[in-house]
């Protein structure tokens, strides 16, 4: 049984890697492999997102360990010289095999607005108001939900009217790491301020991704919004302050 084990994941070229958080205390279970019994545990686990096509290599990893080995002896002096134990500690290296993964290109026919998303996703939107005064703030919230490479996708753009003052978007990632990738939500908030009165339309937002189940590209759309802006003395200072203080 291993008393200690030391090793680290090498640099994986061509991959974006994320480590799965595992319990600090390792639990060993008995497994039968190739005619022998082994005490096994999951030492570390990573989710890999390939960033290029072709043959990508996961190098061999060497773990340095200290193993408790039982001493098969009837001589009581052996236990005495081993500190009263029937086990001795020996140093042992474990070498994992090198792996080569063949990564295919995505199919041709990518939509012009392809986000880089690969997985299964949905998108929804909401707006804080559709009737406001000049210099008031309007905020649109997009939520991209699903399972896949959520952290790596390009966020959609909202096409505000040209007379609106537009602020940098704020992103809140709420992910859980699973064997299938990242599961959860990417929440994007957009803030803009109309400087002129009038009726305006904010077009629908498109989000295109590659769907793993159907092996096809899919494009999702939100609803468009119509805004009625009246001339007035709106004040967006507090809304702007709250928005800009949010962490990306």
Model-derived regions: residue spans:
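Surface-exposed interaction/ligand-binding surfaces
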Residues: 1-248
């Amino acid at each position: 049984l291993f008393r200690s084990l030391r090793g680290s994941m090498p640099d994986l070229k061509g991959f974006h890697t994320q480590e799965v958080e595992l319990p600090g205390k390792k639990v060993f279970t008995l497994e039968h492999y190739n005619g022998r019994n082994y005490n096994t545990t999951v030492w570390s686990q990573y989710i890999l997102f390939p960033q290029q096509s072709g043959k990508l290599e996961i190098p061999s990893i060497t773990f340095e360990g200290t193993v408790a080995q039982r001493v098969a002896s009837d001589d009581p002096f052996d236990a005495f010289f081993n500190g009263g134990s029937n086990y001795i500690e020996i140093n042992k290296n474990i070498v994992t095999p090198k792996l080569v993964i063949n990564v295919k290109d995505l199919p041709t026919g990518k939509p012009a607005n392809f986000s880089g998303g690969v997985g299964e996703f949905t998108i929804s939107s909401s707006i804080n108001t559709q009737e406001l005064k000049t210099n008031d703030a309007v905020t649109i919230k997009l939520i991209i939900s699903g399972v896949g490479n959520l952290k790596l996708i390009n966020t959609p753009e909202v096409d505000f009217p040209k007379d609106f003052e537009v602020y940098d978007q704020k992103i809140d990632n709420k992910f859980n790491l699973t064997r299938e990738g990242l599961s959860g939500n990417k929440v994007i908030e957009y803030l803009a301020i109309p400087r002129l009165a009038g009726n305006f339309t904010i077009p629908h937002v498109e989000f295109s991704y590659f769907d793993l189940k159907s092996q096809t590209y899919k494009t999702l759309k939100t609803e468009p919004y119509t805004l009625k802006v009246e001339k007035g003395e709106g004040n967006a200072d507090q809304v702007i302050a709250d928005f800009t203080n949010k962490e990306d």
